[in-house]
């Protein structure tokens, strides 16, 4: 059994109305078996298990983020060590949340629209025609709400790759014309991952507000390196939890 099969056990199931006798010799796992296995995995790989459940939306991410925060605080990074304690305590939690958001992304996930800040609308200054009681029309400039064209008023956008639309492969037009039959290749935009990663420029913009004299060297060797280590830690812990679950349920 793998971790991807766990979320369905957290969803309520409708009763099976049938006159068929249930099988008594089935080798399948019951819900009780799965829950017991989860308890054992949680005791052996608490961080990885919490990270996965938080990623799929089953569990609140607070515990997983706290575990990542403890890991980040223990990192011996020269750039972060030079910061004042106040600035360090402001930057590290942000980097942790950014890394968790990057780890949680998939082709099916949604993200807040950055163009409208999740509101679905833009406040724009437009010329509006006003009519007085006497019938005269006057043109005035007013702030009006307009639908965001990027998210179409939803306030969120899909994180799926725009090149392959979450498929991981795209049509190879050159070879298709050559062979006369559809030929596909790995999407060069997402490298087959099916989704786009969070651009680290967002994190850099936030860090630069707290560290105005931030240089490229400090960013890549310090803050960006911490983000990469945190994301790698997430995947390592999830893989360890997966190994423990398979060992328990084999």
Regions found by a protein language model. Give the residues of each.
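N-terminal alpha-helical interaction blocks
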Residues: 1-130
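Short linker/helix segments within small regulatory modules
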Residues: 135-141, 174-182
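Short helix-loop boundary/capping segments
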Residues: 162-165, 174-176
